[in-house]
């Protein structure tokens, strides 16, 4: 009977998206291709190609509602990560793609006529996925373009933001992972 209850509990967790992270229950979800609903938490890199570093549980709600801006004075703007969700005039190099006439905000997303937000993987595919053209950028001083795969894009975006926050607020050092601190974010591959 006990085994049956455990099986039913496990199946219920799978069906509702409840998972256990380090012994704590949390609601996590797969990242849909596009959505008008902000997730609480998503798991990035479920298909990580690294033999050392695995997935990254990412708390979207915390990053989008707390004072996580570089200077700590406000919340992050949606376009800090969802960079295509702003007007073309607002884009800063090397960004080129714009998919909105207004800057994405939580209020704009809640509007009845708002377009859904696309997932990163819509453009930034996993290395080796040739189903679409992966964006590239040639950085100043470089001759070879960098292919902005999903992994490269996440690392650039997350690391640059974290490093800038640590530089702006030295008290964060050791509390917020920087570019060289992999395991605070990544689960080790077992």
Where are these regions (language model features)?
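Positively charged n-region of N-terminal signal peptides that target proteins for export
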Residues: 1-4
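Bacterial N-terminal signal peptides
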Residues: 7-17
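Compositionally biased, intrinsically disordered low-complexity segments
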Residues: 11, 21-22, 105
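Boundary at the C-terminal end of the N-terminal hydrophobic targeting segment
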Residues: 17-18, 24-28
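Residue-level signature of transmembrane alpha-helix interfaces in integral membrane proteins
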Residues: 18-19, 91
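Sequence context of c-type cytochrome heme-c attachment sites
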Residues: 26-115, 121-125, 129-174
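Short, low-complexity, Pro/Ser/Thr/Gly-rich segments in the mature regions of secreted, periplasmic
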Residues: 178-189
């Amino acid at each position: 009977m006990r085994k049956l209850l455990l099986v039913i509990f496990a199946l219920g967790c799978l069906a509702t998206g409840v998972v256990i992270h380090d012994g704590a229950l949390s609601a996590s979800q797969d990242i849909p291709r596009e959505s008008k609903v902000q997730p609480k938490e998503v798991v990035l890199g479920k298909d990580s190609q690294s033999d050392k570093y695995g997935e990254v549980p990412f708390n979207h709600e915390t990053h989008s509602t707390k004072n996580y801006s570089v200077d700590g004075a406000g919340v992050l703007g949606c376009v800090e990560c969802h960079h295509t969700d702003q007007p073309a005039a607002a884009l800063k190099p090397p960004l080129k793609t714009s998919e909105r006439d207004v800057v994405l905000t939580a209020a704009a997303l809640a509007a009845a006529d708002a377009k859904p937000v696309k997932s990163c993987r819509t453009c930034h595919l996993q290395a080796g996925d040739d189903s679409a053209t992966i964006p590239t950028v040639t950085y100043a001083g470089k001759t070879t373009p960098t292919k902005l795969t999903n992994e490269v894009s996440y690392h650039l975006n997350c690391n640059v933001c974290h490093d800038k926050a640590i530089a702006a607020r030295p008290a964060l050092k050791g509390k917020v992972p920087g570019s060289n601190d992999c395991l605070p974010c990544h689960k080790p591959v077992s």
